[in-house]
Amino acid sequence: FAAAPSQNEFLSHLIHSKQIDWSRINAFHMDEYIGIHPEAPQSFGNFLRQRIFDKVPFKTVNYLNGQAENLEEECKRYSELLLRHPVDIVCLGIGENGHIAFNDPDVANFNDSHLVKVVELDPICRQQQVNEKCFETFDLVPAKALTLTIPALLKADWMFCIVPFKNKANAVYNTLYGEISEKCPASICLLYTSDAA
């Protein structure tokens, strides 16, 4: 699951679905700031806990630990969980810079050999967090995060991309009509195919 204000309406409707057997679902969140306390309002895990993870009876809920002492080990731990529970569905958004999860243009790699990695957040991404009222100032936005990589997201059987806000219009346009390139990481979604269909 993506954690962003753009997902609020979707998540609020999803938790009321009578057609989903939540007890069969292993839930994951796809990115987390490094250095943010897990119960801080800005924590993506906390965001999802409040909006969905604590509202329905998942089989398991798996969190990235942005406060892990050894971030490489945390990436390995979460990667092993993803391999143990292959992803059926990814629900994601698109950032103003075209990112998916925290795969900003400078760190996006369509052929990444990792499932989870540490990334440096670009200034557009960090400013978006301020504009969306997640942080008061740019300097309060962490400079680094953990994220599922693009290949990890594309392993899903189904992908749902929810982008309701006007401030994302340019990113959506570039995704749909621009070059498929790591300069607009979301553009890779145009090549996504599902074996499950």
Q: Language-model features: where?
A:
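Glycine-rich N-terminal segment of FAD-binding domains in flavoprotein oxidoreductases
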Residues: 1-18
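Short beta-strand segments
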Residues: 2-4, 29, 64-65, 91-94, ...
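Glycine-rich phosphate-binding loop
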Residues: 85-110
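Class I SAM-dependent methyltransferase SAM-binding "motif I" and its flanking Rossmann-like core
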Residues: 101-148
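Conserved small/polar residues in nucleotide/adenosyl-binding loops
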Residues: 192-197
